[in-house]
Amino acid sequence: MAAPTAVATASTREKPRLSFWQIWNMSFGFLGIQFGFALQNSNMSRIFETMGAKTDEIAFLWLAAPITGLLVQPVIGYLSDRTWSPRWGRRRPYFFVGALLASLALIVMPNVTALWMAAGMLWILDSSINISMEPFRALVGDLLPSQQRTTGFGAQTFFIGVGAIVGSSLPWMFANWFGVSNTPEPGHISLSLKYAFYVGGLVFFLAVLWTIIRTKEYPPENLAEFEAEKARTAGFANGLKESFDGIFHMPKTMRQLAVVQFFSWFALFSMWIYTTQAVTSHIFHTTDTASALYNKGGDWVGVCFSVYNGLSAVVALLLPVVARATSRRFTHMLALVMGGVGLISIYFIQDYHYILISMVGVGIAWASILSVPYAMLAGALPSNKMGYYMGVFNFFIVIPQGVAGLILGPLTKHVFHDQPIFTLVLGGASMIMAGLLTLRVHDADDIRLPAEAESAETLGYDALAPANPQV
C-alpha cells in the first residue's frame, strides 16, 4: 500500500464508510479467537486435573490468564500503535503471529502428557490469544468512521457470541452427536476433547486469516507526524508507569466501580476455575478423571458455559429497557445478585440438567458485567483521558483474577476441605457483594444506556480501544 500524500491528520479527516461485508470481514477473526477462549475457559481445569493436579493447585495454575492479560495486552497495544508496513499494515502482523501461535497451542494442548506441559501450554495459549485479540479492538477505530463504530463492535460481539456457544459445546457435540469417545485412558485426554481442540485450532487460524486477507488497513494520515509521535512517546517503561500511576488518581466513580469490578471478576474466575470440579464431584459424585461419569460432567460444563454466553447476548437487548425504567445502578445490582444466586444454587442441585437454570442467572450477570460498568464510567471521565482511564480500569479485571489464583487453592483445601462446590458458593457470595456495592456508585443522571444492545466491546469503545475486558 502506497504512502498517502494527504497531510490531514486522523482527527480532521473522515474515514470512508465501509459496506456490511467489509465490516463482516474485519470482524470475522473474532469467531476464531472466541473459539480459543471458550475451549480454554471450559476445559483447562479438566485438563489440569487429568494431568494430576490437586484441587488446591488448579487455581494457582490458572494464574497464567490474568498475568498474560496484564502484560501482553499493553505491550501489544503499544507496539501495534507504532507499527506500519506498506505491505503488511499495522494490526495484521499481530493477527497472523498470534493466530499461528494460538492455533499450534490448541493442537498441542490435548496431547500433553504431564502437568508442567499443560501449565506451560496455557501460558503460550493465553499469550497468543491476547496477541491476536488486542489489535482487533483497535482495528475498529482505525478503519471505521465514528457513526459506524457501534456497528463494528456489534459485529465483533456477534462473532464472540457464536464462537463462545459453539466452542464451549464442541466436546459435548463430538461425544453426543458423532459418537466420539469421551472416556480416556488414565492420565490422557479424551478423544472428544482432542477433536474439539483440533477443530478450535483450525477455526482460530482460518477465521483470523480471513480477516487478514480480506481487510485493508489505512496508512497513517501523515507519516511524518506518525514518526514524530513514535519518537515523542518512546519508552514503554514510561507508558507502564503512567498506567500504574493512574490507579492512584482515579475519579470517585471509577474508584467505586473498581471495587464492584473486583468482586465481580473474583466471582467469575472462581466459576471458570472450579465449575468442572464442583459439578463432577458434587453432582456426578466422581473425581476419577478417566471415568465416563467425570468426562460426561466435564462435557456438560461446556454446554452450561455455552448457555450463559448465548443467553447474555439476548439479555443485552433488555438491559437498556430495565435501566431506563429504573436506573443503571439498580439494573447492575439486580443482574449481579441474580448471577450470585445462580452460582450458589448449584450447591442444591442433584440432577445435572438443572444447572442450565443456574446459568440463566450467570448469563444475566455476564451481560451486565460486559456493559453497564463501562456506561457508568464513561459519564465520569474527561473525554481527553477516556482511553487512558479505561486502560487503567482494565487492571481491576486482571487483579481480582490474580488474587483468586493465589487464594482460592488454599481456601478450597484448608477451609472447604477439598470440596470445590463451596468455592463456587464463595464466588456467588462475591457476586452478590458486588451487586450490593453497585448501589454506592455515583452515576451521572444525564448519562443513559443506548437504546440498542451493546456489550463492553461496544459501549464507549470509540474511547475504550484498545482496552479489553476479557481474560
Indicate where each model-derived feature is located.
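C-terminal transmembrane helical hairpin of 12-TM major facilitator-type secondary transporters
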Residues: A323, R329-P373
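Helix-loop boundary and gating motifs at the non-cytosolic
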Residues: A8-P66, R255-V260, S264-T289
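Intracellular loop-helix junctions on the cytosolic face of multi-pass helical membrane proteins
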Residues: M1-W21, T113-G120, I129-S132, F136, ...
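Intracellular juxtamembrane helix-capping segments at the cytosolic ends
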Residues: I131-L144, S368-P382
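Loop-to-transmembrane helix entry/capping segments in MFS-fold secondary transporters
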Residues: T55-D56, S146-Q156, G298, L381-F393
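C-terminal ends and interior cores of transmembrane alpha-helices
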Residues: F95-A114, M338-Q350
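Hydrophobic core of transmembrane alpha-helices in multi-pass small-molecule transporters
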Residues: A105-S132, Y354-S368
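Helix-to-loop junctions at the C-terminal end of transmembrane segments
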Residues: Q73-W88, V314-R328, T412
